[in-house]
Amino acid sequence: MLDKRLLEVLVCPLTGGELYYDADSCELVSENAGLAFPVHDGIPVMLADEARKLEPDTK
């Protein structure tokens, strides 16, 4: 789980854009950067090298 107050102040380290928390995958997602940053024991790992690339939306 991620502290709600922390989520309010964090931004994507690459774009400066908004992040949202995906509780199912325990990741902070930056749609603008196309990356998902892992959260380990409530601590976000905000390193681009550690982030997972998001799959393109194929709607």
From Swiss-Prot:
GO CC terms of this entry: cytosol
One Pfam short name: Trm112p
InterPro entries named in the record: Trm112-like
Gene3D superfamilies (alphabetical): 2.20.25.10
Organism: Anaplasma marginale (strain St. Maries)
Family: Belongs to the UPF0434 family.
Protein name per UniProt: UPF0434 protein AM070
